[in-house]
């Protein structure tokens, strides 16, 4: 089914699949691809937090926005050098309930964009506070843009599905 925006609900199982597929994409790059140079500085398998962001996160919360694509962000503690913040990795989420976007050539499902950030201001073992610190206090276009839409935690597992931000409103679930 080709449709610009899927209105299918996003479930906890979908969030888990998005996390699993996205971390696998990063592991592929950072452990056996061109990103191997970061392996000594960053444990890609242990982010401070991972989150579904932007339009799909809005749809998870409000059930109205629809899903054009999925944006999954990983946040790591800064360690000597920043991770490549301009890189975007992609993979094909082929869950049939979401269909495919007609303009995304080469995808049989919805495109997933995977992004990473290394951040200096964070709170260990508190992903909600870490995300609030990033969204409210980092002076970056990424933080501002994410805060204007929505952020739903994917990791750590104990926080899966927690909405921490929706249209510049911050929640402490």
Predicted segment positions?
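Generic low-polarity alpha-helical segments
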Residues: 28, 39, 50-52, 71-74, ...
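N-terminal regions immediately upstream of nucleotidyltransferase
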Residues: 1-36, 64-65, 81-84, 140-149, ...
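Conserved catalytic core of two-metal-ion nucleotidyltransferases
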Residues: 88-145, 151-153
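Short linear motifs at secondary-structure transitions and domain/linker junctions
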Residues: 25-28, 43-51, 87-92
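Active-site nucleotide-donor binding segment shared across nucleotidyl transfer reactions
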Residues: 31-70, 75-80
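Short, isolated positions within intrinsically disordered regulatory regions of eukaryotic proteins
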Residues: 42, 77, 93-95, 138, ...
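Short, solvent-exposed loop/turn segments that connect beta-strands within catalytic domains
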Residues: 42-46, 107, 159
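Short, conserved charged micro-motifs
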Residues: 78-90
């Amino acid at each position: 089914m080709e449709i610009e925006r899927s209105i299918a609900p996003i479930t906890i199982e979908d969030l888990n699949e998005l996390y699993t597929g996205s971390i696998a994409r990063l592991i592929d790059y950072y452990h056996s691809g061109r990103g191997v140079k970061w392996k000594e500085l960053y444990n890609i398998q242990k982010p401070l937090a991972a989150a579904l962001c932007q339009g799909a996160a809005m749809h998870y919360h409000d059930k109205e926005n629809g899903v054009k694509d999925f944006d999954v962000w990983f946040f790591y503690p800064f360690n000597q050098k920043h991770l490549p913040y301009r890189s975007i990795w992609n993979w094909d989420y082929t869950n049939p309930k979401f269909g495919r976007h007609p303009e995304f050539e080469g995808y049989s499902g919805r495109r997933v964009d995977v992004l990473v950030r290394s951040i200096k201001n964070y709170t260990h073992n508190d992903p909600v506070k870490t995300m609030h610190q990033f969204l409210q206090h980092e002076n970056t276009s990424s933080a501002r843009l994410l805060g204007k839409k929505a952020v739903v935690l994917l990791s750590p597992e104990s926080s899966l599905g927690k909405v921490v931000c929706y249209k510049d409103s911050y929640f402490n679930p």
